[in-house]
């Protein structure tokens, strides 16, 4: 068996988050890390700060989020150079303030997402990068339980399940890749790179994890921690690591992937 590397992104994420969420974040974190971001970074929708602190440990990062409770958790990390509580459509920064703005699985939760992108462009410097990860329409299409009902001819139940899962995920915009690219271009950004990732076999892990990850939710509600024993001595956690490791090291990029990663630039 592969020896557990407690410094790799997979372990760092699944040892602190529900395994299905940690699995997704570890793959996204790898993409952000591979970009070798330079200078100060704004994390738009930083939440509790877990992803960025694990992914970019040596970067200077400011965080902004509308949820005060999440920002309190982020502050305890002693990682961010600054934290601000604010909505994304009224960013409290001067024009051309940042070279790099990242937003990981955030924009899909915002009803008026175009206003947020407009604000991002305002505070982004010329030549600066806006880097995002968002779900696309493959997320909804590839849900395994919905596909099961469709094969039985139960299309209405399949569609109801898809709506329910988007509601649970708080998705306002599980939109096609082309729609996301269009939103960025409409605000004057140029697409420098983009790809889909998280193919159906990966999405199935995420989907079913919402059921099998229930003990982590109970832990968080009772003790304020998703994982009570985040060490390699935790037998169950170790087995989950060995199970997910081949997926983590495999090719997560896929035209049929449920998420889209985009690197855009302000001209």
Describe the function of each predicted region.
Residues 1-90, 94, 100, 117, ...:
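Conserved N-terminal segment of class I S-adenosyl-L-methionine
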Residues 51-52, 111, 140-141:
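Glycine/Thr-rich phosphate-binding loops of Rossmann-like dinucleotide-binding domains
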Residues 90, 108, 139:
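Active-site micro-motifs of SAM-dependent methyltransferase domains
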Residues 103-106:
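A short beta-strand submotif of the Rossmann-like class I SAM-dependent methyltransferase core
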Residues 110-111, 124-126:
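Helix-to-beta-strand junctions that scaffold the AdoMet/dcAdoMet cofactor pocket
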Residues 114-119, 129-262:
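S-adenosyl-L-methionine-dependent methyltransferase catalytic module, highlighting the catalytic core
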Residues 264-267:
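Active-site beta-strand termini and strand-to-loop segments that position acidic
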């Amino acid at each position: 068996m592969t020896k557990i590397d407690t410094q790799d992104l997979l372990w760092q994420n699944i040892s602190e988050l529900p395994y299905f969420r940690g699995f997704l974040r570890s793959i996204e974190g790898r993409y952000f890390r591979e970009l070798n971001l330079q200078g100060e970074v704004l994390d738009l929708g930083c939440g509790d700060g877990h992803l960025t602190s694990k992914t970019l440990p040596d970067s200077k990062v400011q965080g902004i989020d509308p949820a005060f409770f999440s920002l309190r958790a982020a502050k305890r990390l002693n990682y961010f150079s600054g934290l601000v509580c604010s909505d994304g459509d009224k960013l409290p920064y001067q024009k051309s303030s940042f070279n790099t703005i990242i937003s990981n699985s955030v924009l899909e939760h915002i009803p008026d997402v175009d206003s947020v992108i407009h604000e991002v462009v305002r505070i982004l410097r010329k030549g600066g990068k806006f880097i995002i990860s968002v779900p696309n329409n493959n997320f909804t299409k590839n849900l395994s339980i919905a596909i099961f009902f469709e094969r039985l001819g139960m299309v209405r139940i399949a569609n109801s399940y898809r709506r329910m899962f988007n509601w649970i995920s708080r998705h306002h915009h599980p939109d096609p890749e082309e729609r996301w690219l269009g939103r960025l271009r409409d605000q004057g950004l140029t697409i420098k790179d983009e790809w889909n990732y998280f193919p159906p076999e990966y999405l199935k892990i995420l989907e079913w994890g919402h059921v099998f990850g229930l003990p982590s939710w109970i832990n968080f509600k009772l003790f304020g921690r998703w994982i009570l024993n985040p060490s390699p001595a935790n037998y169950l956690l170790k087995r989950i690591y060995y199970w997910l490791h081949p997926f983590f090291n495999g090719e997560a990029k896929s035209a049929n992937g449920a998420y889209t990663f985009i690197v855009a630039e302000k001209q």
